[in-house]
Regions:
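A short, Trp-centered hydrophobic/proline-enriched beta-strand micro-motif
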Residues: 4-13
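Glycine-rich, charged/polar anion/phosphate-binding loops
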Residues: 11, 24, 40-42, 54, ...
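Glycine-rich phosphate/pyrophosphate-binding beta-alpha loops
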Residues: 17-18, 42-48, 86, 123-127
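A short core secondary-structure module
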Residues: 34, 40-78
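Cytochrome P450 core scaffold surrounding the K-helix E-X-X-R motif
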Residues: 19, 105-111
């Protein structure tokens, strides 16, 4: 995967689990030198194009364990989720495991309990805290360019105080979010970053990006729902 030759996916979320991964129903039963996996995962990024899936399942003692499952293994099936109105650039899938047999060596030896997958999510959320700023910057750029070129009553709408207020809010939110993510990065390098710091940064920056996208769509008017601009992709 590091060389870009293999695609992987992270199988944690379940149809009835959502934000409660500890309630997962996917299970792994030891059978000699193998494990047999059964269950379903949902909203898995790259699921149907992956070569290998990291599947989280409960063993017979109820402990959450991680298993590396090649996607061509008998009993493994990935169904693409179509007809999405959002996240259209991201492949989402349902994973179905029906008596999927993997060797005991597929078990991640040091991953034990709910903290194992959650530690992975902390790293992902750190990236999202930064990525949301890119979305915010994109919708701001679209809104600024459009407001300068679009005129009403013989005046660019960028000169209207209401539009200016929306643009200033976007700049302020982006600046605040950038400082937050930058400080979080320093704490990460220092080893003082905690999972709650990451969760708050992700929450605040994603909230700011969504707010900016809604404001940008209002500034663009009807053009805001077209794919001529990137605003609607970030709603």
């Amino acid at each position: 995967m590091a060389a870009g030759k293999t695609v992987g996916c992270f199988g944690l979320t379940e149809p009835d689990g959502g934000s409660d991964p500890g309630a997962m129903k996917t299970n792994a039963v030891r059978d000699g030198e193998s494990y047999i996996l059964n269950g379903r995962k949902m909203w898995i990024t790259n699921g149907n194009i992956a070569d290998v899936a990291l599947v989280w399942a409960k063993n017979e003692e109820g402990r959450i364990k991680g298993f590396l499952v090649p996607t061509d293994t008998s009993g493994f099936k990935a169904n693409k989720v179509d007809h999405k109105m959002s996240m259209r650039a991201s492949v989402k899938s349902e994973l179905v495991l029906d008596d999927v047999r993997v060797p005991a060596t597929a078990l991640l030896p040091e991953a034990d309990g709910l903290s194992a997958p959650l530690s992975c999510l902390t790293q992902a959320r750190y990236g999202i805290a930064w990525g949301a700023l890119g979305a915010l910057e994109s919708v701001y750029d679209d809104a600024l360019r459009f407001s300068k070129s679009r005129s009403t009553f013989d005046k660019p709408i960028a000169g209207r105080q209401l539009v200016q207020d929306k643009l200033v809010d976007m700049v302020a939110d982006h600046t605040r979010g950038l400082l937050l993510a930058w400080r979080l990065g320093l704490m990460k390098d220092e080893g003082t970053m905690a999972y709650n710091h990451v969760s708050v940064a992700k929450r605040e920056n994603v909230r700011s990006a969504l707010k900016a996208a809604r404001s940008a769509r209002e500034i663009l008017g009807g053009s805001g729902i077209t794919l001529d601009y990137g605003v609607i992709r970030h709603m």
